[in-house]
UniProtKB/Swiss-Prot annotation:
Protein name, UniProt field: Septin-4
Organism per entry: Homo sapiens
GO CC annotation: axon; cell division site; cytosol; dendrite; dopaminergic synapse; microtubule cytoskeleton; mitochondrial outer membrane; mitochondrion
Lineage: Eukaryota, Metazoa, Chordata, Craniata, Vertebrata
Cysteine disulfide links: none
Record has Ion transport as a keyword: no
Annotated spans, Disordered: 1-115, 428-448
Length: 478
């Protein structure tokens, strides 16, 4: 067989039956000749591919050729060549197509993994996962929150704090007797506890003010509280201005729950003085204590009276931020309900009682049970929602951006005034010619030493005069 002539001459099989073609294919090994043969005889009905014995019984419908994967659509020169095999068991193989974005594994937050991008989503950069990164870092670091409770004794401050955070912060507290309370002054005590819930750690610090408002003369009893808040601002300012700023502990007071007695007709003078003295330093949230001693109409009346007096005396309590336009209606309604509940009428209890076949935290009276977490009985749930679930971060932001910045600006202004005053004093000293103070001649020196000292004094005076003349000429020239 002359292979140099291709399919010319004797290269074409004379027997074109199926058996003859099969024998010819078995004897021929050149792929180019096989391809040319298949092309020349593709229209012949008697030419069948040697895949199966029953091919002749099938309808003559061309079988679709497997498509190449989309992986090579953008770069056609790298498409692998497809060549028919010269054997009876001829098969075609293709690489599986890459997974689509919908079929690829997803990250735990429902986003596509930016490190597993393929050709079909090459426009996906991955910065959409930045909130997830911030979330992981914040959860790993934990959160700090400092809460101050203020008010006279017997209003349920400790009980309410324990009810809010489901912990006992005052297990080591010792109650003072009546005689000890007579000479008691306002103290500042701190209770710190680490709380973890679903992997989120919170370091809670409770600042209590025992002795506040318990004396007969309560003049300026709020000063220790104001000084404590300023001290925390000062300490944070020093740490922030120092060299080591990596591990700054934030002890600034983020919120102050001020308890108002339910037995008055509104705000007392002490309440007004306290809130006016601290409203520029801390976020004040007024609390109407022991709401179970009042009827629902009395609660509404006292709330309205307290709000009017707060506005009348110009007291700036914590203002809830406005809702964004993209917030859902449920959140807007919840926020509006929180704003209308100021001051929060609360009840605290660490006792679990049985009510209607279920165990709840509340207080048992002869006429019924007051449930702490029942919105129809008090505002405890609303206070907890505001303080922990919805506005804790905003309380910290207002403390940092408003109250601390005001204190920091005052410190910088005071430091600037001191520097300017010192510069002015030095300038006057230079102009008066006393830059180099001349020491007095010590008594008991010999005449030669006195003469030498006086000569040096005269030389210093001449040098000062020359220096002043040079400065005067420079001012005139410029």
């Amino acid at each position: 067989m002359d292979r140099s002539l291709g399919w010319q001459g004797n290269s074409v099989p004379e027997d074109r039956t199926e058996a003859g073609i099969k024998r010819f294919l078995e004897d021929t090994t050149d792929d180019g000749e096989l391809s040319k043969f298949v092309k020349d005889f593709s229209g012949n009905a008697s030419c069948h591919p040697p895949e199966a014995k029953t091919w002749a019984s099938r309808p003559q419908v061309p079988e679709p050729r497997p498509q190449a994967p989309d992986l090579y659509d953008d770069d056609l020169e790298f498409r692998p060549p497809s060549r028919p095999q010269s054997s009876d068991n001829q098969q075609y193989f293709c690489a599986p197509a890459p997974l689509s974005p919908s079929a690829r594994p997803r990250s735990p937050w429902g986003k596509l993994d930016p490190y597993d991008s393929s050709e079909d989503d090459k426009e996906y950069v991955g910065f959409a996962t930045l909130p997830n990164q911030v979330h992981r870092k914040s959860v790993k670091k934990g959160f700090d929150f400092t809460l101050m409770v203020a008010g006279e004794s017997g209003l349920g401050k400790s009980t309410l704090v324990n009810s809010l955070f489901l912990t006992d912060l005052y297990r080591d507290r010792k109650l003072l007797g009546a005689e000890e309370r007579i000479m008691q002054t306002v103290e500042i005590t701190k209770h710190a506890v680490d709380i973890e819930e679903k992997g989120v750690r919170l370091r809670l610090t409770i600042v209590d003010t025992p002795g506040f408002g318990d004396a007969v003369n309560n003049t300026e009893c709020w000063k220790p509280v104001a000084e404590y808040i300023d001290q925390q601002f000062e300490q944070y300012f020093r740490d922030e201005s120092g060299l080591n700023r990596k591990n700054i502990q934030d002890n600034r007071v983020h919120c102050c729950l001020y308890f108002i007695s339910p037995f008055g007709h509104g705000l007392r003078p002490l309440d007004v003085e306290f809130m006016k003295a601290l409203h520029q330093r801390v976020n004040i949230v007024p609390i109407l204590a022991k709401a179970d001693t009042l009827t629902p109409p009395e609660v509404d009346h006292k709330k309205r009276k307290i709000r009017e007096e707060i506005e009348h005396f110009g007291i700036k309590i914590y203002q809830f931020p406005d809702c964004d336009s993209d917030e859902d209606e449920d959140f807007k309604l919840q926020d509006q309900a929180l704003k209308e509940s100021i001051p929060f009428a609360v009840i605290g209890s660490n006792t679990v009682v049985e009510a209607r076949g279920r165990r709840v935290r509340g207080r048992l009276y002869p006429w019924g049970i007051v449930e702490v977490e029942n919105p129809g009985h008090c505002d405890f749930v609303k206070l907890r929602t505001m303080l922990v679930r919805t506005h804790m971060q905003d309380l910290k932001d207002v403390t940092r951006e408003t109250h601390y910045e005001n204190y920091r600006a005052q410190c910088i202004q005071s430091m600037t005034r001191l520097v300017v005053k010192e510069r002015n004093r030095n300038k006057l000293t230079r102009e008066s010619g006393t830059d180099f103070p001349i020491p007095a001649v010590p008594p008991g020196t010999d005449p030669e030493t006195e003469k030498l000292i006086r000569e040096k004094d005269e030389e210093l005076r001449r040098m000062q005069e020359m220096l002043h003349k040079i400065q005067k000429q420079m001012k005139e020239n410029y």
